[in-house]
Amino acid sequence: MQILVLAAHPNLERSQINRVWINALSSTADVTIRNLTEIGGPTMQFDAAAEQAALLSHDRIIFQFPFYWYSAPPVLKSWMDQVLTYGFAYGPGGDKLSGRELLLLISTGGPADSYHAGGYNNFSVDEFLKPFQQTALLAQMRYLRPFVFHGMAQARTDEIEASVVPMLQHLSDPELDPAVRQARLLKELEANPELAAAVS
């Protein structure tokens, strides 16, 4: 599987966890990294044809970004507006990304317990990420379970470095696609009638 990581940090060199993740991913086989801030420059202008060609040569697309104001930094939105165009990603003939996977790799400043009803952010991260999920669905992509590191505002260096292993494990999880996990569970139920009876 060919993986394309679109890094959308406004200043990757000054980043903490995103830079650590990029360093780890850069030494991983079959992974291509594109720094959108560097490519788009200060005007955030992209060569749509070149970016679309990069998407088409990969199977899994990863949006990597720090979670700012409950969304992504402006550079990713600019990239999406210019690259995921009518006739390419949606609309008549816009099925070029059909079957490809989209995964979000993000870090939040707030702790995990702040992202739920009753927490100070009120909603789960999954709820905040619905626009990205719908983007994937509109483009006929498979939206995979995101990897989220919470609590960057107070994270220690050792915690940041320790996040690399679970991050890489997440990206290589064969059951990231819920359809794959569901198929396995159904097969297990078919093979074990007693288990099927227990959950009915």
Where are these regions (language model features)?
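N-terminal beta1-alpha1 ligand-phosphate binding loop
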Residues: M1-T37, L168
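Hydrophobic/aromatic beta-strand patches that form the interior of the parallel beta-sheet core
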Residues: L4-L6, T32-R34, I62, L103-L105, ...
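Short amphipathic alpha-helical segment that frequently serves as the phosphate-/nucleotide-binding helix
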Residues: N18-N23, A48, K77-M80
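Glycine-rich phosphate/pyrophosphate-binding loop and the adjoining helix
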Residues: I22, S26, T135-S200
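N-terminal beta-loop-helix "entrance" segment that forms/cooperates
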Residues: T32-L55
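A short acidic, helix-capping loop that chelates divalent metal ions and anchors anionic groups
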Residues: G40, A112-H116, M152-A155
